[in-house]
């Protein structure tokens, strides 16, 4: 089934007849010719023409569209021509370009010149349109587009496609045409307001280009007015950093001795900034180590490399050196400039982790050996003490009990020597039975009240008496048992 939808034919753009394009609007007119759709098959009613004549403020825009549509009919083939060759289905290729994108590329001057050309051709287009239409309708009616009272194109029955359901659907090419015709009066009003926007360069390269080519950008020929910094805000050495960047286009005009003077001045300021960091006692008895010196050398080399990178190779390290100095800044640490070198000081070698671990383990082993020796010697002392002190076979003394028994034995010996218990020994020998524990108290009292004459005679005759250990042990055992019995009674 053949589609009843009317499509816009494919139109090729031919601008070969124009040798040059002096004005952008000439290209715009050629493009707008492709946008317009063939509208001669539609006729409008007469009452819409009366509304058009009442509004004179939109008459100029109507005539421009009328001229463009008439020019389009000269080049655009009719659908009947395609049908003559047996082509029923046309390729629906959309060549519509929004007019706002085309108009945005034009300048204000081109818009003004184009409007003048349009006004000059309005009278001729009106005459030709009236001559071509014998029926008495205006040229706008012959082109198939009418304008309402608001200066907009009124929709006709041809703009809608009758589908099978009976609903009216606006064709896409007609929608685009209406949208373009609504935007074109707004674009013309903007061109008539004569609004000029000056483009101010914002980068250093554009400023340099504007200064070298003053004829291209006449709106901003003095970049100093936009990049005027007060002198007190920039230090002297930082002003030289901006010098190669800002005067990149003026290097051919500068003198060589001025550039050398600026480089020498920057070098002196750079040296002074580093000399301020050196302490007064840095040469003799310095507290700085070799690592501090290496860090300072590394920072100095990084600073020099960054300065050379900012200058873009203009200030090389070779030109930083003074003519009368023995060496440059880069050769100061190697060629004899010992300003930053500190005297080396031998540090104690720090032991490694394995050495520290071995030393700690050895110390721990020696401490354990000493502890075992001390405990062993203490046990030996207690054993010897238990052998000296008279004990009973049933005694199982701890270390504390052994010490207490030793104090009691010492007390017993002191009493024996002070109270002349020699008589007690004689009494024990007279009884001959060491099992008489019941008379121990009487024996002790007799010893306390014994005759001193006998003791003195024995001392004078035989000297100090010698008491055998077994007898002392027996007496201590008797005294100990009596003391325990008295303690229990109390």
Swiss-Prot record:
It is found in: Nucleus. Residues 362-413 form the bHLH domain. Keywords: Developmental protein, Differentiation, DNA-binding, Nucleus, Transcription, Transcription regulation. Residues 54-64, 339-351 have a biased composition (Basic residues). PROSITE patterns: BHLH. GO terms for biological process: gastrulation; Malpighian tubule morphogenesis; mesodermal cell fate commitment; regulation of striated muscle tissue development; ventral furrow formation. Its main location: nucleus. Residues 48-74, 98-167, 330-359 are annotated as: Disordered. This is Protein twist. It comes from Drosophila erecta (Fruit fly).
